Amino acid sequence: MPPMLSGLLARLVKLLLGRHGSALHWRAAGAATVLLVIVLLAGSYLAVLAERGAPGAQLITYPRALWWSVETATTVGYGDLYPVTLWGRLVAVVVMVAGITSFGLVTAALATWFVGREQERRGHFVRHSEKAAEEAYTRTTRALHERFDRLERMLDDNRR
């Protein structure tokens, strides 16, 4: 991408998001992470309640249920632990959605941070290049004006 175009895009993104656009992403990612931890803890507890006493249930202790909720939220799903009751499966759906959403927000915040850093770097390069080009243009213009002034003086001197 040409530097001028990337600089324009960087300015456009900064204009749209403002200075606090990146902070907004980090706050959303932080809130999603806190919510995920709450869902993991509550989901583990609810899974134990839902699964306790069911035939073939494996999620009958809190530590096992907590491990299962982390597996489920991260979409690893080893398959070693799984709910067997309807209520346990509904809890699993909530844990899955919370995990997928939270990891998506954190990933988006990280990507925004990396892209923002690169855009800022390119924007600085573009501003520096534009300033250097403007200074060169000004010097060239002044030199041309001086030459034209000299030529006009020479023509005036020759006419006299």
Swiss-Prot record:
InterPro entries per the UniProt record, alphabetical: K_chnl_dom, VG_K_chnl
Subcellular location: Cell membrane
Topology of this chain in the membrane: Multi-pass membrane protein
Chain positions of motif Selectivity filter: 75-80
GO CC, any one term: voltage-gated potassium channel complex
Keywords assigned: Cell membrane, Ion channel, Ion transport, Ligand-gated ion channel, Membrane, Transmembrane, Transmembrane helix, Transport
Transmembrane domains' residue ranges: 28-50, 88-111
Parts of the chain on the Extracellular side: 51-61, 81-87
GO biological process annotation, one example: action potential
Task performed by this protein: Acts as a pH-gated potassium ion channel; changing the cytosolic pH from 7 to 4 opens the channel, although it is not clear if this is the physiological stimulus for channel opening. Monovalent cation preference is K(+) > Rb(+) > NH4(+) >> Na(+) > Li(+).
Subunit structure and binding partners: Homotetramer.
Miscellaneous section: The amino acids 62-79 are situated in the membrane and are important for channel structure and properties.
Name the UniProt record assigns to this protein: pH-gated potassium channel KcsA
